Amino acid sequence: MNFNKKTIEDVQVKGKKVLVRCDFNVPLKDGVITDENRLNGAMPTIKYLVDNGAKVILCSHMGKPKGEAKPEFSLAPVAKRLSEMLGKEVVFAADDNVVGENAKKAVAEMKDGDVVLLQNTRYRKEETKNGEELSKELASLAEMFVNDAFGTAHRAHCSTVGVTEYLKPAVCGYLIQKELKFLGDAVETPERPFVAILGGAKVSDKINVINNLLEKVDTLIIGGGMAYTFLKAQGYTVGSSLVEEDKVEYAKEMLAKAEEKGVKLLLPVDHRVAKEFKDVEAVVTEDQNIAEGFMGLDIGPKTEAIYAEAIKDAKTVIWNGPMGVFEFENFNKGTIAVAKAMAEADATTIIGGGDSAAAVNILGFGDKMSHISTGGGASLEFLEGKVLPGIAALNDK
């Protein structure tokens, strides 16, 4: 996949109607946005276009309304908040069919530097099927397309891929440009030693990531629930910990592949365990083995030290997935230790979206990282070496 894409700075935007696909899939409570990270992420691109006299038409999905106009998925609160953040009115085109009379009228009346937000693209069933009709309707509003929604770049939808068939040039905004720079450099030309840290509950979610990263990294660190499947593959006892029995063979293959490639594969050497899946006081094991009746819920202190040491020596670090049950105060220590080691590392540090991003932000280490990806699923597919349709559809430099 070519990561060298045209950006908003490579095209003339003044006086042009520009359709911008943003990621405004934000959490709402009683009509109020509870996490503005994604709105903040979209600001540099929107501001650049406004300041350079473009007519800015924003579009996004939110949640899963499944092709119905459900009011709880309306982007009206987003338009209101964007108006406050930009210090100028963002006109909301409240069409249940997304590109309707309101949208057409609002766009026709735009002056340079004006901003319009369309209704939730997933109000239309064909959005997620990459249907021709909606793609054409979206394209008909504008003279060029900007994709700045990395979070949906792994989806071939009307507003990410279909629209580019009918609307050229198609370029990336600052957010996607930054994602491509950090993730692209890491998987293509990392500064070494290159360390990847994978956590989270399931091996099955990360099969292709493990396989692909073993071709690229110097050290692979595994924590979280998926570590127990690997430990079982090595012959350790894991008590009643989460194990994917059908992935034990696969874990054996990956351990062999790491050895063959000369990759250090680090697994926990001790654990924090409990008798049930609850936030109770942790028992720390002596070694890799977990006794009958206990389940591993976090990595142990010896493991923390080993992982922190590997991170400290690295020049590039990518992390995806917590080391334990981060929601439980007694079992968030491993995740905190990894976040802290990354914050202190003299390296390019990349957080691959999802739970790790939330953890790093909650712990207050966000500004210490080189890059926090805005796409959980998209960054995982990127690390799998897959082509992301939303990126592939943009014009190369």
From Swiss-Prot:
Substrate binds at residues 23-25, 38, 61-64, 122, 155. Its main location: cytoplasm. PROSITE patterns: PGLYCERATE_KINASE (PS00111). Pathway: Carbohydrate degradation; glycolysis; pyruvate from D-glyceraldehyde 3-phosphate: step 2/5. The keyword Coiled coil does not apply. Signal peptide: none annotated. GO terms for biological process: gluconeogenesis; glycolytic process. GO terms for molecular function: ADP binding; ATP binding; phosphoglycerate kinase activity. Pfam families: PGK (PF00162). InterPro entries: Phosphoglycerate_kinase (IPR001576), Phosphoglycerate_kinase_CS (IPR015911), Phosphoglycerate_kinase_N (IPR015824), Phosphoglycerate_kinase_sf (IPR036043). It comes from the Bacteria. It catalyses: (2R)-3-phosphoglycerate + ATP = (2R)-3-phospho-glyceroyl phosphate + ADP. Monomer. HAMAP family: Phosphoglyc_kinase. This is Phosphoglycerate kinase.
